[in-house]
Amino acid sequence: MNRTVNGSGMKRMALLNDLSCFGKCSLSVAMPILSACGVETVPLPTAILSTHTADGFGDYVMRDMTDEMEAFAAHWKRLGIRFDGVCTGFFGSVSQLSFARQFLRDFADPSTLVVVDPVLGDNGALYGCFTDEFVTAMRALCADAQFITPNRTEAALLAGCRIDAPVEELLEKLPVPNVIITGVHRGEEIGYCARLNGVWMEIFKPCLPGTLHGTGDVFVSALCGELMAGRAAAEALPRAADFCDRCVRATAARGEAHWYGLAFEDVLKEEREQ
């Protein structure tokens, strides 16, 4: 029997990111959210971790997946698998970033949605595991994307600006068609500042106390779901921001016991029951 791996009619998205087995971030967030959006997900783990890396878990176990990534992609290429979208997150080395660019050359075409969440740093500093060479390589990957979703620190690193540069300057200097800067604080609010095909947009929500892990991953996953459904960027952004805000509030309702990630399952369950 001849079988085809393409043509089912369901949108398919490759997810290049780490898998943290406990805790909610990266692939463990992206796969269920995108599946709920009707998108077929194909994960390609860049690393596998016992937990995510937040304080509270102690010494986590991590395995690099570079060799497996290359072998998996080679198999997919032999099968002729195509993707309607590619979303990338954490990479552990410059060689993995080079692989990601080759992956796009092998599996993407001009119609493929490419979203890069450029994991580099936070709170004004580059993560200690990364170098200036890594930032340069990430900048090159971002140039291949239609959308990037850096936080303010990552936007400054990519733009080559000082960390406290105005958001407007960062948006102006990042040469990607659609840039969404996440986690922007304004008084008692937190939100997103974006340049979407030359149009500026901002969305802010009341900021709740405390630190929540995986918020950016939930937002990016929801954004990809909206974009894969064919919604324009100016419609997809507020819808994804609203979903993320609902997840934050659902998590707050669960209290300290759910400190390790967003309770996005509660929101997906609510939507299913409506």
Where are these regions (language model features)?
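Charged C-terminal helix
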Residues: 234-274
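Phosphate- and divalent-cation-binding pockets in alpha/beta enzyme and binding domains
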Residues: 95, 99, 157-158, 222
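Short, small-residue alpha-helix embedded
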Residues: 209-233, 237-239
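Conserved N-terminal subdomain of the carbohydrate kinase-like
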Residues: 2-116, 120-128, 265-273
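Conserved phosphate/ATP/ADP-binding segment of small-molecule kinases
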Residues: 126-201, 210, 231-234
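Short pre-catalytic strand/loop immediately N-terminal to key active-site residues, enriched for Gly-Thr
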Residues: 21, 200-214
